[in-house]
Amino acid sequence: MVALTQIGAEFKIIATAHLKQIDRVLNGLTGSAHSLKEKSPHAITVGFAAVNYSEEWTGMEGTRSFPVKRTSARAQQESDETARRLRQVAGPAFDEFLLLTFRATNQEPFPFAWLNAAGIAADYGAALVRIADSYEKRF
């Protein structure tokens, strides 16, 4: 054995076309957690997923851009459903799973805001405490 993984993390961001991407993102997250556990059964697995609640987003692929607009109601509904599936399907695959919600457009001047900054900070801090506790117990 060359190395032993003690903590492994996977991070996925869904910025647009949420429901078109959800299966690929869920497979990536859960696959990463399972792969890590196969190789290092005692490893602490941490999953992060970020969901964009913005009505507008500009995707970039090389030199091409793809502007997307959703109604406010559509953005809310699609983002809520994406967040629900992430928690329900990906969450249980990890020892710790943190869902981050934000608004960003990927358009100048590149505005960004957490939906609930205080709540995200509290959830992140609590996750770090639990991870540290798990680390002390496992290693």
Q: Which residues fall in each region the model found?
A:
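Conserved catalytic cores of phosphodiester-cleaving nucleases, focusing on short active-site segments
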Residues: M1, T5-A15, L29
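Generic beta-strand structural signal
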Residues: T5-I7, H34, P41-T45
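Structural beta-sheet core signal
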Residues: G8, V46-A49, L99
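Surface-exposed cleft-lining segments at the edges of enzyme active sites
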Residues: K12-R24
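Short, charged, amphipathic alpha-helix that recurs within catalytic cores of restriction-modification
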Residues: I22-K39, R85
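Nucleic-acid nuclease catalytic cores
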Residues: E38-M60
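C-terminal tail/extension regions appended to the core domain(s) of diverse proteins
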Residues: E55-F139
